[in-house]
Amino acid sequence: MTFDFSKVSTPKGKPNDLDWQNPVSFFYKLSHPEIKDLFPVQRDILKNWFDEYKKGANDKMVSLNTGGGKTLIGLMIAESMRRDTSGKVVYVCPNTFLGKQTIDEAKKYGIKTASYLRLNGERPTWVNEPDFLQNNAVCVTTYHAILNPRSIFKNMEIRGVIFDDAHLSLDLLDRNFSLEVKDDAIIKAVSEIFKSSPHIKERIASIQEGDPIPLVMIPPIEWHKQTASIKDILNANEEIKNGLSWMNIKEKLDRTFCFISANKLEIGMLYPDIKNHYVFHESVHRVYLSATLPNLDDITRVFGVAPSRIEIDNPDYRPQRLFVFTKKLQFDDSEKIIRENLKDISQKTFVLTPSNEALTPYKSLGALIPTNSDDVPTKIDSFKKATEGILALANRYDGIDMPGGTCHSLLIDGLPYTGTLKTRFFSEYFHNHRNSFLRSIIASKLIQAFGRTIRANNDYSVIFILGSKLNSWVINMDNKKFFKSDLYEDIEIGIGISETVSSLDELKSLTKEILGQTDAWKVFFEEKKNGLKPVEVLSREEEQKNISLAKIEREINDLFMAANYRECLELILKNQSDLASYSQPIMGLYLSIAAICCLETNDVRVGELSARAYGINPIFGAPVISDKKARSLQAQRIIDFGKALPSFDWSVSGTTFDENLKRLGDILGFNSRRPEKEGDGTLDVCWEDEENN
């Protein structure tokens, strides 16, 4: 039998079509019978991005209203990068659920994808892996699959990354570089080490007694001194020892921060140590997608890059949102009454709560409530097909869409639970830090939630706001900078209307007006929108100032993580005026880091800097008492040099010798580091002068 070579396909090269890489052009050549055209705003964004991309611009942030077709834009950009580079491009989602939705969207648009998702079981599995390996398809995956230290992608030549829902990634990145421990014995053992610490000993005692309220940050200098003992405790636990989070932080444990409550211990970095991560190499093109307006300075601190925005005004985006604030309603027990009469107020309502416990009131109403995560899609599908009823979900603020008249009534019951212990602690103690991560994350979740029942330019929805904390958060004027102007205008209108509602019957009547789309409602809403004064948001000048400071904070973090203590110290001191004017509590934190740098470099300023941190807030720990007298830097270096000479003994281990050689470089005034220890693998020890020679 002769083998038939004619059936072997010929390898495909790049087509000669000049528009083959242009997303606006090739969109019309894809097979998507259900999708007739791009929205004008989508076309403008894709054109803007492609023009910038061809000029070599990187790190672009694309912001688009919920329901505005963000996923299509992301997929088109990913496909454009794949075609242009003939390389591997990954589309990164917060979780598997959203990954599946992205794949379904890609099929509708005629875009071929591969995926690496946890579809069944505990481990992710491949679908269409050969297509991705041969650079013939974009791969849809999750943040965890990309960021974990054993990532299957880290040895691949990744050319492009789409970070979808970038507003959620702030929290996701933080968690990947944090160790969370709920083992009572470990919490007890670690807290025992610090139980005599003057400022926190009472709260440590309360934590050890099981009090759920106290939350403690171990003073950074005290934590730094005790990390060898901490490492022994954690390494004794096999689950922790073999965990991916521990792999991310164990070699830099002395540069982490620890937070303890009665039921949780959390160890993490100030900001994720991703400077040398493979997806942040210069050769990788990155795009960040968001349905909110995240602070770019937050993105800069967490990602270590400063994206520039691609934001196109959409004049056709005119949804009708009626916010009902129970805090403003003029009748008693309004929240209880709304919960008990929800079916009478609105025939069909989608309910979102922060926890499973908060779902309890809706069980008696016969609400569809999933029994587990696998049951979520089934319950959603049943609700979409129904003409009445309630769907109640816990902590599902994004990815659940109610398009095409599926549901026009949304109830959000309670402020979203979010953030790590670190974020919670910073929010409580650094409350005047103007761009608190917690506020930014909460805003992102709420904006996502508000968009669940608004899926088109001219859609409409009533949105009930329940819970004292949630009402206060949304009404608070200080949080308006997190909202786009059109959303904040609707919130202002809702506050005014809610103040006029004095009974359940009036609330029913009001809800009937918007859900029935009466002429009276439409005229009223349009007049109110047109009568509002323009909302002041963060100016570009102020945003750029915040970004500049965020870059400095990120550089401090990177130097600290690299154990480049001397340069880190000098950078903090050089910028202390700007840091202090921005936030005194944050300045206290950086003074604590500066004091640690002094400890590591035998700098006599450790007492002064730790005392200044303590003066800002005792949470940073008692001042370090130094028996050294202040000397000039030159005199200190001469003394340190004399002490260092006996360390150079060829009989010591290679690791010890390298560390001694690094310290000698510090003494002589060089920027000294150990590339091999940092994962570089090129040099054992490197001394650099100010010109990096």
Regions flagged by a language model, labelled:
Residues 456-582, 586:
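Long, largely alpha-helical accessory region at the distal end of helicase-like NTP-driven motors
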Residues 27, 44, 50, 61-65, ...:
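Conserved coupling segment at the C-terminus of the helicase ATP-binding
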